[in-house]
């Protein structure tokens, strides 16, 4: 029963579900009925549902039938009416068709026109859109064209600015166009191209600057020279209120424009062509020579591109290389001044450029970099000058070099470079200059001394007299009173040497100019150099003349006279130096001239040479002596050679009248002593082994001739018999042997007032031995004669006693 109730309940639920599904089918769109039918198939009551569905369809059919039956009459009436209007409708259709055909025929052209109008409208719209787009793209294209033009004309920095505007302002507005994408892709290449081209311009500029540094430096040094000349004029003609030019005014003005509208400034390589100006026109400034726009452009371009440090490093590296090239002097620089000038011009040009870059750019170069380069340049320049100047043997070239170095230093000092080391080096070159002057003046003195005739200067008129006195400070009242013609006591080399000493002093003074030295330093330099000239150069020249083999007594006498007058002129040289340096001789540490010593030494050397020369002449005469030491004849006159010798001495001493008295007296005494000594040696020489009393008698006549010459007073100033004392040894020796006064000699020997005080026992024994041998040889039978035997015994006895004196003296 319960099962039946459950079946009934299920049947009711199924029926309700089917009813719901049917309502849903009726109310749902056919396209969406699938899910509803899916629920039916998912169930198990398909048959019942179909029954329900058929039942529902039948119900609807009945309702439709009822409705149709209700409206059937109206439908029939409507059909009847429709049939009635069908003919009219056909007529209307025909009319409409005909009208349409006519309209189609008539509107065909209109349609074509409308189609054309449509196309025109479309074209107009496209043109308008195209114009709008072109107006948007045109600035981009114009900027790109401008960029190309700027690059073509090498206006790289403006081109870079244009490229920035193009990239950041214009291209973003039209970035969807394909050509813009091409431009965007090409921008890095353009930047690199600008970078490369600007670097190429910089390289051209650097190369051109390197080649034209000579011209730049020459211009700078000319301007420095003009400024110095102007300052000298101002100093010589001071004016109230005048102002010295500032350092900045002395700078060379450069063209500092970064951009220029002229094509020339855009295409230059750094150097502009300048025609040579006339000498009397203003020296062109460096703004007429140099355009630094390539440097500025490249610097700005690299700064904009973020590569400024790369540019700075490259620029400094290249300039360092160029500095090393500039500082390397040519091997033949020392041969001409132009070699030094070109070397200095290049260095000045280099640093003028760097100084300008320092003052016109922000950090491209800095003071530390400039100072480093200058230190290197200074050391290399000084080393090069030391090396090459040492080859200079021409003092004029050394002087010109000094002036060039001073101008070089002054030029760089204007630009703020320290140049003290250059002036210190000039002091070294000053010593070298002094040496070259000494060598030059050695040749001058040699020529003067070689060409001199060593004769007093004759003058025949007042003009000639004044001319000589004007050349050499000489005053002699007695000579002035003498009538013309007359002679100066000195020869021509005296005024010539004196004037050359003054010329040397002038030459030394020239070197000291512009060295920023005090008057005391200049005076000290001149005095030291002059002392070297006197004590070394002139002294050597005089000594060489004095020591010449062919020098004569007349020349030596004249040299003594000349040096005496030159010695007196030293005080005038002191005054001359004082006048040109304005430093009084009494100033502390003032160096004194050593001219007096120089001329005294030369005079003493000449005196010694006179003595030597006289002795040599005496020796030459003595070589003519031809004594017959074995003669038994007694002569009655002096030997011929001695007579000639005495005549020579008389004529020689007659020339000594202008010599100082002591010199003539010393020469005469020296000659007599040498003659006496030579005669004594002649008498005692070993080759003369034997001699006779007759030979001694002849020798005695010769000695008497010498004594007669001494008594005649060949040179004034000797006291009575003073000159005869030169022959006293010979006289006493000869008297001893001729008078055979041995008893007196032996008895008085050793006493202060001995008659034969000057006779040495050794000398007496030597001569006695020669006479003893002669006596034995020539008197073979003398032993048989009592007188001869007694004489021989006496000789032996005297000889024995002499030996005793000698031995006692030695003991």
Swiss-Prot record:
Disordered: annotated segments: 260-280
The keyword rRNA processing appears for this protein: no
Positions in coiled-coil regions: 50-119
Keywords tagged on the record: Coiled coil, Disease variant, Dwarfism, Exocytosis, Protein transport, Transport
Pfam families hit by this protein: EXOC6_Sec15_N, Sec15_C
GO biological process, one term: vesicle docking involved in exocytosis
Cellular-component GO terms for this entry: exocyst
Family note: Belongs to the SEC15 family.
PANTHER family: EXOCYST COMPLEX COMPONENT 6B, SEC15
Function as written in the Swiss-Prot or TrEMBL entry: Component of the exocyst complex involved in the docking of exocytic vesicles with fusion sites on the plasma membrane.
Disease listed for this protein: Spondyloepimetaphyseal dysplasia with joint laxity, 3: An autosomal recessive bone disease characterized by multiple joint dislocations at birth, severe joint laxity, scoliosis, gracile metacarpals and metatarsals, delayed bone age and poorly ossified carpal and tarsal bones.
Binding partners and assembly: The exocyst complex is composed of SEC3, SEC5, SEC6, SEC8, SEC10, SEC15, EXO70 and EXO84.
Name of protein: Exocyst complex component 6B
Taxonomic lineage: Eukaryota, Metazoa, Chordata, Craniata, Vertebrata
Gene expressing this chain: EXOC6B
